Regions:
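Hydrophobic alpha-helical segments of integral membrane proteins
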Residues: 1-9, 57, 61-65, 242-249
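Membrane-embedded alpha-helical segments of integral membrane proteins
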Residues: 1-30
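Hydrophobic alpha-helical transmembrane segments of multipass integral membrane proteins
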Residues: 18-24, 43-53, 245
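Membrane-interface helix-boundary motifs at transmembrane edges
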Residues: 30-40
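Transmembrane helix-loop junctions in multipass membrane proteins, especially transporters and channels
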Residues: 35, 64-71, 255-259
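A structural signal for short, hydrophobic/glycine-enriched beta-strand patches
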Residues: 46, 51, 55-239
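Extracytoplasmic/luminal low-complexity segments enriched in Pro/Gly and acidic/polar residues
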Residues: 223-229, 236-265
Length: 265
């Protein structure tokens, strides 16, 4: 039930949806004789929306997440394996078109291609089935297989874990599939904002990994002030950040991670 609850509440608590719900509630209050309170709520919702559109709110929220685990640098030493978390495939578009369609996390699928050129002996694990509540959605791995094969990755070099539906299951199921040995060096590839929660659940699963963050969306600095270039990007960054903060809180409260805001060791 955790998976279902997390998806439903995650959808309802997305910033834009909260504002819409607040605006709808405010529109109904005048009929209960509370016009002043209704007007204030509408003003607050509009002010928050304008702040997210005209100020780098998303950047301010993303920077602490994306800078928590910095890129490891060019000298990674020996690399025995690479775990790539799913979430880059737009399953609805891919299923409808019949070929790979990606979202803003596409770099998760691109980075391993270059990594395997540098570390051809490394094993590659892709973990992720579908994070959708809708039945009949085609699994991410079906599209990733074809994409990586066309990119020149040997099919025999990749293990596909296709049962996991969330980050916690990514860690547990990929460890069972990869069976990492003591002393092996594994990289974890996922979006930079997603890395704190991801590393934490892999630690909980006793699968030691080195963070290899990709797909940065922030400037990396809290002092960088700018006007977002698009409403979609501005609201998307806020939603991505809030999704991770809520995910960290939910995982910590349910014992899926040991630290509320994990840090490098």
């Amino acid at each position: 039930m955790f998976f279902e609850f997390s998806k439903v509440f995650g959808f309802l608590l997305a910033p834009v949806h909260v504002l819409v719900i607040g605006a709808l509630a405010a529109s109904l209050w005048p009929y209960s004789g509370k016009r002043a309170r209704s007007f204030r709520l509408m003003q607050a919702a509009l002010a928050l929306l304008l702040a997210m559109l005209l100020a780098p709110v998303g950047n301010l929220l993303l920077v602490p997440l994306e800078t928590r685990f910095p890129p490891p640098g060019s000298d990674l030493g020996r690399v025995d394996g690479i775990v790539v978390l799913g979430g880059a495939v737009d399953e609805v578009t891919s299923g409808g078109q019949g070929h790979l369609g990606v979202n803003s996390a596409a770099e998760r699928l691109i980075a391993p291609i270059a990594l395997l050129q540098r570390y051809p002996q490394a094993r590659l694990v892709f973990t992720g089935a579908s994070g959708s509540l809708m039945p009949g959605i085609q699994k991410e791995g079906d599209f990733v297989r074809q994409f990586w094969h066309e990119a020149g990755i040997d099919k025999g070099q990749v293990l596909y874990e296709e049962k996991s539906r969330n980050t916690y299951e990514n860690a547990v199921f990929s460890k069972a599939l990869a069976q990492p040995k003591p002393g092996e060096h594994w990289l974890l590839v996922t979006s930079a904002a997603h890395m704190p929660r991801s590393v934490a659940v892999f630690r909980k699963a006793d699968f030691e990994v080195t963070a290899y963050p990709v797909g940065f969306k922030s400037t990396g600095s809290l002092g960088h002030w700018y006007v977002p270039r698009s409403a979609e990007g501005a609201l998307g960054n806020v939603e991505s950040a809030m999704h991770e903060y809520l995910g960290l809180l939910a995982y910590y409260l349910t014992g899926r991670i040991d630290d509320a805001f994990p840090a490098p060791r």
